[in-house]
Design a protein with these regions (language model features):
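A conserved beta-strand/loop capping segment in the N-terminal third of enzymes
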Residues: 51-113, 121-124
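Redox-cofactor binding/interface segments in oxidoreductases and associated redox assembly factors
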Residues: 11, 142-143, 259-261
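C-terminal helical "tail/cap" subdomain of flavin- and related membrane-associated enzymes
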Residues: 283-375
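N-terminal Rossmann-like FAD-binding beta1-loop-alpha1 element of flavoenzymes
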Residues: 2-33
């Protein structure tokens, strides 16, 4: 079997893999992307984030908002985010946009239906093989899933619906609605209005289990009926997924292999926000790729934020009701730019202290000590 040689091999054509291939398109590097699914498989998810970092996908942003709201029981807080607009991007649009550039480039190949890959470190790179090909490259960027020992998972299920009067409910995103009856669990509803007649309504848990058993489509339908007083609507599509809220991911898998994407540690443990963190990681890799020193040491989160996340996740895991109250109060009481920067990995030291001082002192100290005992 003849071995074909590449500069880089990218494993996985998800958000991270396609983002990296998109940046490397039409460069001097010869690149091969290996994807386990067929070319016909298209994901249908919504990626949302505050625009705190410039990304190259502004043309395909589905919608952008200058404010959003959160609620707890009968209290509602409307938050201004003009400085950092809340943006929504459809994964389907992202895949089409990036693949269009990649497939029209002269330096990137994409192979689909790739199963049972074997990676072998060589003295001058990596040998990547399957039953029907053998490849060699200088470096592998691997976005494939790995088994994680995560204590908490964010699991979600959503319905895209059409109804003539949806704009009468919320005209802006309702990011966290804690008004349901699941008081002993960290659960919230999420409402994203794309047009006057179409919205995404999602049920989200922070759960110790990574399965989707808690997520009931019937619950979402009942919530729409009880809270929004809507009995008849069209379901356009559905989405479901899980995000590890892990604090222990590794970035480097070997001398010639670098993990990228969700399973490399870029996902913010306390929020699950991933898309912009992937773009930051990819920009770092592309910027440093010309040095030919592939011992990348990218750290997506500061040690201070990770420590704060440990405390926050400890509260959620052990006292979900207080976790919901704290989350709501943070949006209600603290300057909106401070909160958004904190949740988006770009806070100043002053922002971090403002967040700390806003927390209920007894709860903060209790879980601070709990985290320190487990260090």
């Amino acid at each position: 079997m003849q071995t074909e040689t590449f500069d880089f091999i990218i494993i996985g054509a998800g958000c991270a893999g396609l983002s990296l291939a998109y940046r490397l398109a039409d460069t001097k590097y010869k690149v091969c992307v290996l994807e386990k699914n067929s070319n016909n498989v298209v994901t249908n998810k919504n990626w949302s984030f505050w625009k705190t970092y410039n990304h190259p996908y502004e043309k395909i942003i589905k919608k952008s908002w200058d404010s959003f709201s959160v609620s707890y029981e009968k209290q509602r807080a409307v938050v201004d985010c003009k400085n950092y607009p809340y943006q929504a991007l459809k994964s389907k649009d992202f895949e089409e946009y990036t693949k269009n550039k990649i497939t029209n480039s002269n330096n990137i190949n994409i192979l689909y239906d790739v199963k049972e890959l074997q990676l072998k470190d060589m003295k001058d790179g990596v040998e990547v093989s399957s039953s029907n090909f053998k490849l060699h490259c200088n470096h592998v960027f691997d976005s494939s899933p790995v088994n994680l020992n995560s204590s908490i998972w964010q699991v979600f299920k959503g319905l895209y619906i059409e109804h003539e009067n949806l704009d009468s409910i919320f005209k802006i995103p309702h990011l966290m609605d804690f008004t349901d009856q699941k008081k002993d669990e960290f659960h919230f509803m999420y409402f994203l209005p794309f047009t006057n007649t179409s919205s995404l309504i999602e049920s989200t848990y922070f759960s110790k289990k990574e399965n989707l058993e808690k997520l009931s489509e019937d619950y979402i339908k009942q919530f729409i009926k009880d809270e929004y007083k809507i009995n008849s609507y069209n379901i356009i599509s559905k989405e479901a997924g899980k995000i590890p809220m892990s604090l222990h991911n590794k970035f480097q898998s070997g001398r010639y292999i670098t993990k990228i994407g969700s399973y490399s540690g870029v996902t913010r443990p306390s929020t699950g926000y991933t898309f912009l963190n992937i773009q930051k990681q990819i920009d770092y890799l592309v910027k440093n790729i010309d040095t030919k020193n592939y011992n990348f040491r990218y750290k997506p989160h500061s040690k201070y934020l990770l420590f704060m996340d440990k405390i926050y996740l400890s509260i959620i895991e052990n006292d979900a009701k207080k976790g919901k109250i704290i989350t709501f109060r943070m949006f209600e009481k603290i300057n909106q730019n401070t909160v958004i920067k904190f949740l988006s990995d770009i806070p100043t030291i002053a922002d971090i202290f403002k967040i700390i001082f806003s927390l209920p002192k007894l709860i903060f100290i209790k879980h601070l000590l709990k985290v320190l005992r487990n260090e």
